[in-house]
Amino acid sequence: SNISVQKIVKNWIEINYRYNSKTWNFETTSKRIISWLSNYKLSYDNASDQYKIDFNNIIQKQALHLLNQINKIKDYHKRLIGISAIILTGLAYNDEKKLIVKGLDHLKKNIRYNLDSFGFPKSRNINSSIIFLKYLILIREWFKESQKEMPDFIDENIFYLGQSYAFFWKNINFDPLFNGNNISNNHEFDLYLKRLGYSFKNENYEFSDYVSLRNKKINLIMDTGPSPSKKFSSKYQAGALSFEFVSNGKKILTNSGYFSKNNIQLNEMSRSSAVHNILVIDDNSSCKFKKNSNSELEIKDGLKITKKKIIN
């Protein structure tokens, strides 16, 4: 009920109005702003005047904190959540229009830095494209609800990311385990898209250096692309020329998937060519990795594709 939720929010504000590193963590703060504003009927409606003043002050204070910290955040996903929270705050408060402008500026930079000219992640990570799509659609819906003018670049990038979503999920209805991708279960997202009237199609058999050859019963999907540059290789798996084969909706040949938790040995193992169904050349992994200053693996020696020919 409103009373219970607002009591929790009020207690949080009283305890955490001043900054502390635990409760004002960048990602946590971003999600808290989105949660409180998205559920305003519970967190805000029918509250006392003093509660509303305190609520508005803490939301705007947290949004400014995110804006001051965002350039320090390297992870694209955390930045995307923070940018979304900043934009939502700007849309929710008429006197905070500067947050919309600054949030959109950071969104453009995040897209420009992480996505190529065709709207696909420079990391070649399929899951990253879905994450970008989800947040851009969320931001688009906020603009519609607020009845404020939406910039064209949001629709443009949703179109390109939708092409990726159709190719890697809608067309095949399973998760291809390439380059950091794991089992994602996008069925709930499909229902969300349908409810909001989004529909994406991609009838091509090649997209962003991945190839999908299929008929009604079988599907062969293959990575035919080069490795990404070092700065985008934190989750890259040395899977060039790796493939998966599906028959009647069931995987017959599959790659290993990506081990994302903090175990260097298992992470390193999941990124070698040896755990892929792959065309092996000279008994070597297609890429070599090294640990950076943060003990994270990144590409040392990558792979370039000089020429390819696909016969469908």
Segments the model singles out, each with a brief description of its role:
Residues 30, 261-312:
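CBM-like, beta-strand-rich accessory domains located in the C-terminal region of large
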Residues 60-67, 244, 282, 286:
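A short, hydrophobic secondary-structure junction motif
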